[in-house]
């Protein structure tokens, strides 16, 4: 699916009732090389929300990040995740935002990045974000939450914050 194209996205959602939105554009794109990843996130989310509305989807589940109480402390990454959430919610299709800490387990992109770094680098100077607090959640737990959320009207138009009760940094 070409999410840059509204018509392609609309066609891809034809016949669907529910959608799990996992799109995130941290890597630069050759299609939008003048913009930032935040610009790309918003463009793709807007196309997706418009296509979902056009196809009368019943529900979108979006995976974002746990947000600090003070919006002035949002990192660029978390601000982009929140703006993506708001963009998806800007249309008529109900959205459930599941805001999670790092998802731990095989197949999770954050987990895979950290694992590759630790395997390839005997010593690493840790960037500032390594001190950021997080409430990790296991991939199986996350999948159960997603499964229970999809199509559940009680969760429409809501945000759920999920993660471990223990707050850890990436350094921990």
Question: Locations of the language-model features?
Answer:
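NAD(P)H-binding glycine-rich loop region in Rossmannoid oxidoreductase-like domains
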Residues: 1-55, 66-73
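Conserved beta-loop-beta element that borders a ligand/cofactor-binding pocket
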Residues: 64, 86-107, 113-116, 120, ...
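Short alpha-helix in the Rossmann-fold core of NAD(P)-dependent oxidoreductases
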Residues: 37-45, 61, 81, 135
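Conserved catalytic Lys-bearing alpha helix of Rossmann-like short-chain dehydrogenase/reductases
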Residues: 42-48, 80-91
């Amino acid at each position: 699916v070409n999410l840059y194209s509204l018509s392609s996205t609309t066609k891809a959602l034809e016949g669907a009732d529910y959608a799990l939105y996992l799109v995130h554009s941290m890597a630069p794109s050759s299609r939008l090389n003048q913009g930032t990843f935040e610009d790309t996130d918003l463009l793709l989310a807007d196309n997706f929300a418009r296509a979902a509305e056009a196809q009368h989807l019943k529900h979108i589940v979006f995976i974002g990040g746990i947000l600090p109480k003070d919006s002035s402390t949002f990192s660029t990454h978390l601000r982009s995740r929140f703006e993506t959430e708001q963009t998806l919610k800007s249309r008529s299709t109900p959205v459930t935002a599941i805001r999670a800490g790092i998802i731990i387990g095989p197949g999770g992109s954050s987990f895979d990045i950290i694992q590759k770094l630790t395997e390839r680098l005997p010593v690493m100077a840790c960037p500032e974000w390594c001190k950021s607090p997080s409430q990790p959640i296991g991939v199986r737990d996350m999948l159960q939450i997603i499964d229970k959320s999809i199509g559940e009207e009680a969760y429409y138009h809501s945000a759920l914050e999920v993660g471990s009760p223990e707050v850890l940094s990436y350094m921990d």
